[in-house]
């Protein structure tokens, strides 16, 4: 096994120059003492410095697909890193899959479970988990992107608010999941963002022209439920449960990949990146069972098949224990 402590300082300084956030510096310093001597501790850092991009809106643009007569403020694109944390307990080793977020208003930084729909916060109440970054391995596991913007919406019912004000509009901050694609350019700063907007639409942002563009509207009633960037293209999965996947080119051209034929409607399906392959995973769960549904749940996994650079369809994979 390589001895990482023997790396020369000039190489370590080169690595540090490519770190984007203060938390990456924490991970860098946790490797060994010689690495810690290259970078001082981040004692004065009050945040994680999660990487963000400021994105502007076109005049009259809205995510709903309808023209608007009021200006939209800019939005913020945020990269949310996910880590696998290994720590020790009296009962043995344990693992925590968590996403990292900025602290707010001087509050301590916190971890969120990316698998939890109710956004359980680790570090508060009964879910409190303490670990030492020098002794607990922290492994980068992945990342996703979200966009935060403000939009005018009808005022919802509020206690004590006169009823004649319920139909007024107010600015509401909204956060949505998006897919990010880094593009080849001389300065390595060009990127594209795909967002599954409302009314079954897709909208794309290009940093080169700094504007959002409406992608061709979905020809049917199903919305898009999953987006993935893969090999310089976007892939979108609709919510039909029938394995319908669409390729979205940067030119805004949309093409449907031959669907998974002969498939019954799945209860849930997702696009998954696995190394250099794109997988379609379908989950089938009986509708009438709840407490023991895991006993009757089964999956089908398909791999995207490519021929001469074009997508020919998804083929069923045979999974083994080897």
From Swiss-Prot:
Where does the record place the F-box domain? 2-50
Write down the InterPro entries for this protein, in alphabetical order.
F-box-like_dom_sf, F-box_dom, KIB1-4_b-propeller, SCF_F-box_domain
- Per its UniProt entry, which superkingdom is the organism in? Eukaryota
The record's annotation in PANTHER family points to: DUF295 DOMAIN-CONTAINING PROTEIN, F-BOX PROTEIN SKIP23
Q: What is this protein called?
A: F-box protein At2g16300
Give the organism, scientific name.
Arabidopsis thaliana
């Amino acid at each position: 096994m390589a001895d990482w402590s023997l790396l020369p300082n000039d190489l370590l300084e080169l690595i540090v120059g490519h770190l984007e956030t203060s938390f990456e510096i924490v991970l860098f310093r946790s490797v060994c003492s010689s690495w810690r001597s290259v970078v001082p501790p981040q004692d004065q850092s009050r945040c994680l410095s999660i990487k963000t991009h400021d994105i502007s809106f076109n005049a009259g643009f809205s995510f709903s697909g309808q023209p608007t007569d009021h200006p939209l403020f800019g939005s913020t694109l945020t990269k949310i890193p996910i880590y696998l944390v290994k720590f020790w307990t009296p009962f043995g080793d344990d693992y925590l899959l968590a996403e990292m977020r900025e602290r707010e208003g001087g509050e301590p930084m916190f971890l969120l479970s990316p698998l939890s729909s109710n956004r359980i916060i680790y570090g508060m109440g009964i879910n409190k988990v303490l670990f030492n970054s020098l002794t607990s391995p922290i492994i980068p596991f992945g990342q996703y992107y979200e966009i935060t913007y403000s939009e005018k919406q009808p005022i919802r019912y509020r206690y004590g608010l006169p009823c004649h004000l319920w139909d007024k509009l107010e600015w509401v901050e909204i956060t949505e999941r998006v897919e990010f694609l880094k593009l080849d350019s001389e300065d390595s700063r060009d990127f594209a963002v795909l967002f599954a907007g409302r009314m079954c639409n897709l909208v794309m942002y290009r940093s080169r022209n700094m504007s959002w563009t409406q992608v061709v509207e979905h020809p049917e009633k199903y919305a898009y439920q999953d987006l993935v960037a893969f090999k310089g293209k976007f892939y979108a999965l609709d919510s039909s449960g029938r394995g319908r996947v669409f390729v979205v080119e940067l030119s805004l051209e949309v093409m449907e990949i031959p669907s998974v034929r002969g498939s019954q409607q799945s209860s849930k399906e997702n696009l998954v990146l696995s190394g250099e392959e794109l997988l379609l995973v379908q989950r089938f769960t009986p509708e009438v069972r709840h407490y023991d549904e895991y006993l009757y749940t089964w999956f089908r996994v398909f791999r995207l098949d490519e021929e001469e650079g074009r997508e020919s369809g998804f083929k069923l994979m045979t999974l083994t224990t080897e």
